[in-house]
Amino acid sequence: MPIQSLAPRRLYRQIADQLRGLIQAGEFAVGTRLPPERDLAQQLGVSRPSVREALIALEVEGLVSVRMGSGLEVIAREPAASAPRVDTAFGPFETLLARQLLEAELAAQAALHGLPDQLQDLQHALALMAADVAAGLAPVRGDRLFHLGVAQAAGHGPLVRTVAALFDERDNALFEQLGQHFETLRSWQLALAEHRAVLAAILAGDAPAARAAMHHHLQQSHDRLAASVAAPGADAALPAAAAAAAAAAAATAAAAAPGSRRRPLRPTPLLHPPT
């Protein structure tokens, strides 16, 4: 069964379906490795981020293992019975693009129309993020409050629900698995700095700067998932205190509420650069 090129429609699901079919047909036997991400993208005629989403979906299903130094190994011929269903209509990269298009303009409007109490809410959300990052936890609670707060400060009530729906796509199994691989202490430190730039522009009433800062932040969020991650050890320059905070957080992981995604963060990515 040869690999076939695909039309650009919900690509990650099409790619996952085709690779799943090849695995089930025995073209890729259990214990063997799939072609590198780069080669799969070339054979399928699609982008590497779309291939990555598909591979993560297959990992969620229990068909493949995506491990540091081990490549993409087939570990089962059929999806695990206990595996969560990956049924999101849109992949993480498509969702991030939609957020970028929407939230950049909302940030500009927030700079022009934000009320004092709304701006205080943004500062509170940022403080929550900073506290979680300092504790070595993924700061999704404060992150969500911040992005919804920007929409509220923009004065567009219906779009608050739209932003919430897009943000909450992060709770699906595909986005969660991507985060397990690529979210690190360093990536959230960078994201925190980007949020601070957005807030500074909003507080200054500088709409163009707020628009640019939010656009930059969501582009960087996309790139941190889509681009090749740094080789192991690239984050070795993290301050010792930050690494210690992550280790301490790991030791007290039970304190994080189940399902909250405030999981302990690693100092470095789980994976080698995708190939």
Write out the residue ranges for each language-model feature.
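Residues at helix-coil transition
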Residues: 24, 155, 203-204
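Short leucine-rich amphipathic alpha-helices used at interfaces
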Residues: 4, 11, 22, 28, ...
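Conserved amphipathic alpha-helical segments that form helical-bundle/coiled-coil interaction surfaces
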Residues: 99-102, 107-177, 194-200, 209-221
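A broad structural signal for alpha-helix termini and local helix breaks/kinks
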Residues: 44, 154-155, 229
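Residue-level recognition of short, well-ordered coil/turn positions
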Residues: 27, 63, 137, 206-207
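A generic "alpha-helical surface" signal
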Residues: 13-14, 49, 93, 97, ...
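C-terminal all-alpha effector/ligand-binding and dimerization domain
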Residues: 169-275
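Short linear motifs at protein or domain termini
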Residues: 1-108, 112, 233-235, 242-245, ...
